[in-house]
Each structure stands twice: as structure tokens, then as C-alpha cells.
Amino acid sequence: MALYEHVLLARQDISQQQVDALVEQFKGVLEANGGKFGKVENWGLRPLTYRIKKNRKAYYTLVNIDAPAAAVAEMERQMRINEDVLRFLTVRVEEHEEGQSAMLTRRDDRRERDGDDRPRRREGGFDRGDRGDRSPRRPRDNEAGEGA
């Protein structure tokens, strides 16, 4: 049997429990056709790069699969029918990655570094303040006391 990595994007308006139920449903389809599910990673609700079927966010789930090609094809057919599945991608790999995927590792490192998952923003609007790289302004002629 071949090894696959499968990423599933589910709609934003369903709950995490419904996403887990979807994964279990597809696990049943795969096992009925002679395949096995490996590691399942829920990456959570993440923003999409562009809108897909009027959704700006999606629940991402990574699944390691050990199955024949016919079982994967049947699972993908079921995913195309399901309205809660926005997109999916199945890639054949030589071996499954041990431990956490790069997505979860990067997110955990970022949280440890600054304690928050959101990027920092600069304070203020258009005025960014003095950067220290310019000399002080010289006064204009009318500011020097020669009023008009």
C-alpha cells in the first residue's frame, strides 16, 4: 500500500466537533476499502489566501494515510460530494513525517517567543515619530520673527 499525506479544508461555519465527525466519516470510508489512517493533526480555523465558495476562513486538518489508490480515490469522491469540504489535497510520500508537522511546530515556536499568535503592529497612524536619522529642521523665514 502507498503512503499519502492528505490536507482537508472544511467550511468556517461548522464546529470543530463537526470537523472531527467529517474526519471520522472519511476514516470509515478509507478503512472499508482496505486503508488505514495514521496521525491526524487539526490546525484549527485559519484564514484563506483568497475566498473559496464565499468563505474567508477554513478548518485545516492534516491526515497521514496508508491505503491503496482505489481507497484514496473513493475517499476523494466522497469529499467532492460533501458540501462541508471546501478543498482537499492528497500527496503521495515516501514515508510519513515523525512528530508534529512544520505548521504546528512553527505556530508553537511563535507562541513561545512572544506569547501570542498575532503579529505585532506599530503604534499610531500616519505619524511614526522621529526615527533619529534626520537632523533637526531649520526654521522658515516667516517663523524667524518676520511676520507677514
From Swiss-Prot:
Gene3D superfamilies: 3.30.70.60. Keywords: Ribonucleoprotein, Ribosomal protein, RNA-binding, rRNA-binding. One of its GO terms (cellular component) is cytosolic small ribosomal subunit. It comes from the Bacteria. InterPro entries: Ribosomal_bS6, Ribosomal_bS6_sf, Ribosomal_S6_plastid/chlpt, Transl_elong_EF1B/ribsomal_bS6. Pfam families: Ribosomal_S6 (PF01250). One of its GO terms (molecular function) is structural constituent of ribosome. Residues 96-148 are annotated as: Disordered. GO terms for biological process: translation. Transmembrane segments: none annotated. Belongs to the bacterial ribosomal protein bS6 family. Binds together with bS18 to 16S ribosomal RNA. HAMAP family: Ribosomal_bS6. NCBIfam families: S6. This is Small ribosomal subunit protein bS6. The gene is rpsF.
